[in-house]
């Protein structure tokens, strides 16, 4: 079955405060998103439970988002969502999507150090956004990088971005496909080398993949 015939799963992943939403906003205008169910717990909390920042609404929205994702998997409907990618449940979902024949695109956004992420989350809170405790930010940062190394073997296409510099466009570092590097764009930041070190090297036969 060709890519065009498969249901699509588009995942924008990265630690809290890495800048996932900026990548998502760009993707929402791309043809890859055509026909995708965009699963956003913040929108669900706001639209179905009245407040995107209230603890109870956030909890209920997370469960509702999981239900929608599972429904798309069963019905083989294309979908897209953001995730910190720091918990086993998302890994399990991605594995099951792979087994169900979904074409998976992973967009991973990282930074040089979790202190960057913590500062951005603090700024977000000052502007009325939701908070994440610093110990969680640091713990999730490490887990997220580790899980990206695994998901890069499951995904048909993986795109890894560095977003360490505030108020600058995220920089595409490399692309991969099913565990193999496809193209490297200049120098790779040390945090991202933790991922590339677990991938197969670039093959001349794969450079046409996008």
Q: Where in the sequence are the language-model features?
A:
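The Walker A (P-loop) glycine that initiates the GxxxxGKT/S ATP-binding motif of P-loop NTPases
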Residues: 11-14
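Glycine-rich phosphate-binding loop used to anchor ATP phosphates in small-molecule kinases
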Residues: 60-109, 144, 159
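NTP-dependent small-molecule kinase module
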Residues: 150-210
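Phosphate-binding P-loop
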Residues: 1-7, 72-73
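Walker A (P-loop) phosphate-binding loop of P-loop NTPases
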Residues: 17
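Conserved lysine of the Walker
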Residues: 20
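Conserved substrate/cofactor phosphate-moiety recognition/catalytic segment
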Residues: 24-77
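A glycine- and Lys/Arg-enriched "phosphate-lid" helix/loop adjacent to the NTP-binding pocket
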Residues: 100-149
